[in-house]
Amino acid sequence: MNNMDYDPRSMGSYGPNYNNFNPNFGKIRRHKNTSYPGYNGFDPSDGPMNGPMGGPMGGPMNGPMNGQMGGPMNGSMNGPMNGPMNGPMNGQMGGPMNGPMGGPINGPMNGPRGRQMNGPNNGPMGGPMNGPMNGPNNNQFNGPMNGPNEYYSPEDSDGSDYSDSNPNEFDSDDDDIDLSYFQKRQYDKPTYHKFEVTDEYLADYLLRKFGLDKDKVVRSIQKNKKDEFKAMILNYFYKENPKIKHQSINNQYKLFRKWNKSGLKIKIDDLETYYENKVKPHMH
């Protein structure tokens, strides 16, 4: 085809059947200028960036930045980033963007970061994060995220499980312990018994707990008991002598002194206090 051939720029890096991001793919150029001095089969409008053979960046063999056929990203053979064989950054086959086999992350064979067995990110066997066998973080069954929870089982640092252990059961290793140290200590070994709380112990405990003076507490208790006994004697006196409550306090006390055989001296003030509080309010 003379003036009806395909624009080489529209063929992309992989020939006329592969459209590598070129919107002009398949378009026919109808007005090629063949009178350009030194015409070599391509229009000068191909420009220094897009010339398939002799542009300053797209030379067929020795372009300073391009591979044999393509631009700096799409060279099919020897591009510095996408060469299928000897790219300086890629594995055996592919480029970092379009290489079919060995990109820097997914190369299956010889990529510097995508080795077949021990690649650090995506190697199928020994990646540090996802390798099921020999990854540095995920061993065969002990990965902290994907393992079967060894880090959370109730095991001791030596691997022994003490979740259901009995403190009275001893391992066979205990038979090897040297007991000579214990044999040197001679004393009576006490046996535990349930502690019995006596009243005396309880009283002492409460006195200490609340910071009370024992003597003061004892005197207070004795006084209260004495007052209770006085009230009981006076109550008997008025029950046995119901008519005496209509007499004066002096006459009541004279009779009381003769009546009282309790052995406790009760003053007239005690009798009057009891009369005013317990007897007089109930008189009719």
From Swiss-Prot:
Keywords from the named record: Virion
- Stretches for region Disordered: 110-176
Compartments where found? Virion
Q: What is its main location?
A: virion
* Biased composition, class Low complexity, residue ranges: 110-123, 130-149
Single GO cellular component term? virion component
Descriptive protein name: Uncharacterized protein R727
Protein's organism: Acanthamoeba polyphaga mimivirus
